[in-house]
Amino acid sequence: MAQDTQTNTAVQGKIVQCIGAVVDVEFPRDQMPKIYDALKLEGSALTLEVQQQLGDGIVRTIALGSSDGLRRGLMVSNTANPIMVPVGTATLGRIMDVLGTPIDERGPVSTEKYASIHRKAPTYDELSPSQELLETGIKVIDLVCPFAKGGKVGLFGGAGVGKTVNMMELINNIAKAHSGLSVFAGVGERTREGNDFYHEMADSGVVNLENLGESKVAMVYGQMNEPPGNRLRVALTGLTIAESFRDEGKDVLFFVDNIYRFTLAGTEVSALLGRMPSAVGYQPTLAEEMGRLQERITSTKVGSITSIQAVYVPADDLTDPSPATTFAHLDSTVVLSRDIASLGIYPAVDPLDSTSRQLDPNVVGQDHYETARAVQGTLQRYKELRDIIAILGMDELAPEDKLTVARARKIQRFLSQPFHVAEVFTGSPGKYVSLAETIRGFKMIVAGECDHLPEQAFYMVGTIDEAFEKAKKI
């Protein structure tokens, strides 16, 4: 601890400037806090985190909480440690904020184990690449952009195309069937969604309200209404809890909703810290900040972290620096398309834009690979023919092209699926489709075994057998 040797008390400084969430604090010149040290405001629960050393004993900090009421001259003490948050099984079933303080009105988190939210990423020789597939039960994902156990997945989409609903369905299908533990970090999203998620988890038994220790998920929220410091650091708090479980040898699912808000909070803080903005107004340190977070989300020889991250795409522009920087770190990218959503096909995943490193015959097998590529080839051909159809109509197409279009439209509809978490809105029960059934269904459509069925029979069904049943009623 950075202690004053005479009085054996923590080193104190005083506030000399406040600009929004950024606070400058003056300390004795020979006892300046280190970068990332947490400072406590005397007589208040407010924590400040050191970002820059300006010289002459002055450090520039960001406030992890509201800076209302701060003024020059207030005393601040240096804890001489980074932000420390509770980790381990005591966090299960609890909702915490960026500092690890519980916000679920169920008393304090009773644990002796605390960890710093800043730590180095595992070294190269500690890493453990995984080839094992993670079945999600969602046809379009399992077919064209399969997830790897211990991999990183991004759900990309603009406003209102279904990122959070897809995330909730993945949690429903994976976290409930998953024997390991989950950590959910709500980064700058709506408080209502955090509340819905908590109740959904409680109803399904993933959060055990009678005995919290038997819960399987820990939740960390820093929502939209909170200051930028909270939104910037809350992803690290959630990650620290996930890393702690991983280092105990567990397989962890780490959900982040939404990584874009993490970048945006960094942009707000960066401007207040006086850094010159770079492209589109983002912080100049965007790639480094993103890299520091993403490099820690990884699997080691001890345990695995499988991460699923929602990524908001501003103005549906995937070349925007924030989503573009995120792309580089992911194993699978699930791109949600407004065009597909406007056709009423949900999940609105674009099978031609979504990718996965796992879609390799050596990993998924020849059968799966060939079926996925045949589906993408059929859809790509349909996309090329759409201009001709729009100008000349279907009648001008060659017979084989007419057949391709008919199959592509069936594939498009068969890629839709009723979700468990959307039962309230759709009125139809959710479907979980196994990978084997998914491959069988698409193989039959591509091979022409379903050419006699009307295309509406394929809309919002689970397996191919359900499409045959539905066709009988049409």
From Swiss-Prot:
Binding site for ATP: 157-164
GO molecular function: ATP binding; ATP hydrolysis activity; proton-transporting ATP synthase activity, rotational mechanism
Cysteine pairs bridged by disulfides in the record: none
EC number: 7.1.2.2
Keywords attached to this entry: ATP synthesis, ATP-binding, Cell inner membrane, Cell membrane, CF(1), Hydrogen ion transport, Ion transport, Membrane, Nucleotide-binding, Translocase, Transport
Reactions accelerated catalytically: ATP + H2O + 4 H(+)(in) = ADP + phosphate + 5 H(+)(out)
InterPro entries membership: AAA+_ATPase, ATP-synt_VA_C, ATP_synth_F1_bsu, ATPase_a/bsu_AS, ATPase_alpha/beta_chains, ATPase_F1/V1/A1_a/bsu_N, ATPase_F1/V1/A1_a/bsu_N_sf, ATPase_F1/V1/A1_a/bsu_nucl-bd
GO CC entries: plasma membrane; proton-transporting ATP synthase complex
Topology in membrane: Peripheral membrane protein
Compartment list: Cell inner membrane
Gene3D superfamilies found in the cross-reference section: 2.40.10.170, Bovine Mitochondrial F1-atpase, Atp Synthase Beta Chain, Chain D, domain 3, P-loop containing nucleotide triphosphate hydrolases
Pfam family, one: ATP-synt_ab
Catalytic EC class: translocase
Protein family membership: Belongs to the ATPase alpha/beta chains family.
Function: Produces ATP from ADP in the presence of a proton gradient across the membrane. The catalytic sites are hosted primarily by the beta subunits.
Description of how the protein assembles with itself and partners: F-type ATPases have 2 components, CF(1) - the catalytic core - and CF(0) - the membrane proton channel. CF(1) has five subunits: alpha(3), beta(3), gamma(1), delta(1), epsilon(1). CF(0) has three main subunits: a(1), b(2) and c(9-12). The alpha and beta chains form an alternating ring which encloses part of the gamma chain. CF(1) is attached to CF(0) by a central stalk formed by the gamma and epsilon chains, while a peripheral stalk is formed by the delta and b chains.
HAMAP family documented for this protein: ATP_synth_beta_bact (MF_01347)
The name this protein goes by in its record: ATP synthase subunit beta 1
Organism name: Albidiferax ferrireducens (strain ATCC BAA-621 / DSM 15236 / T118)
